[in-house]
């Protein structure tokens, strides 16, 4: 990979986008950016607060503005929010401005990885499994549509997944 193209990680919450993204950026000597962290920095509040006050629609508008800016950077590994692919504009930006890697995982792994995380507003419900199933039905086709590569993250360490992605990019 001679040029430093952007690498955009997409996938559901709990797939490992942030953790794998950090490993990947380190291996490739690139900058790691998490779009949710940037939204929190720009807003001065956490994601849960934005959802509570502005609703999902308000959050998605903020996310779209952040992705518009971040996808114009050069040489970054970007962990996107799980719902970022809902917007056609976001999908177009991601596809046009970098290599998109879909980190795929099972509902069981998502539940195991997110069960104590109170910073996930969509899962603050009596039946998080049902929510994750609905989100998967809605979003998985969008992840597949935008992805240049797909990697399963279920039973592998973040480092192993990052190594797989590096190999795929080298073979590109």
From Swiss-Prot:
GO terms for molecular function: ATP binding; magnesium ion binding; shikimate kinase activity. Its main location: cytoplasm. Keywords: Amino-acid biosynthesis, Aromatic amino acid biosynthesis, ATP-binding, Cytoplasm, Kinase, Magnesium, Metal-binding, Nucleotide-binding, Transferase. Coiled coil: none annotated. ATP binds at residues 14-19, 120, 156. The keyword Nucleotide-binding applies. It catalyses: shikimate + ATP = 3-phosphoshikimate + ADP + H(+). Binds 1 Mg(2+) ion per subunit. Its EC number is 2.7.1.71. InterPro entries: P-loop_NTPase, Shikimate/glucono_kinase, Shikimate_kinase/TSH1, Shikimate_kinase_CS. Pfam families: SKI (PF01202). Substrate binds at residues 36, 60, 82, 139. GO terms for biological process: amino acid biosynthetic process; aromatic amino acid family biosynthetic process; chorismate biosynthetic process. Signal peptide: none annotated. Pathway: Metabolic intermediate biosynthesis; chorismate biosynthesis; chorismate from D-erythrose 4-phosphate and phosphoenolpyruvate: step 5/7. Mg(2+) binds at residue 18. It is an enzyme of class 2 (transferase). Catalyzes the specific phosphorylation of the 3-hydroxyl group of shikimic acid using ATP as a cosubstrate. Monomer. Belongs to the shikimate kinase family. This is Shikimate kinase. It comes from Vibrio parahaemolyticus serotype O3:K6 (strain RIMD 2210633).
